[in-house]
Amino acid sequence: MYLIHFTKEALFDIEDIVLWYEEQRIGLSYDFELCLEAGIDTILRNPAAFQKRHKEVKVRFISRFPYGIHYRIKEKEITVIGVFHTSRSPKNWSKRI
């Protein structure tokens, strides 16, 4: 069983995304949160299944939304370092590694 932790920055990412989607359409943020939760559940079930994007950082793309959950695995611990838009340059998020 893996433990999952979110960095402070990852939590800010999620908060910003949720607020943005709620401004676009009432209830859309809830849809995003459901898809995010499903992505996290998939990571917890099989964290090694997803591709490496940069060094030891893996990404699980979120269904229906253009975001990826970026995380590292160390022993039985998963650390989510960010939730980034797919169009965002790796140079912008690689600073968090």
Predicted regions and their residues:
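Enriched for short, Lys/Arg-rich terminal
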Residues: 68, 72-97
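Solvent-exposed interaction patches of small proteins and small membrane subunits
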Residues: 16-19, 29-31, 51, 56, ...
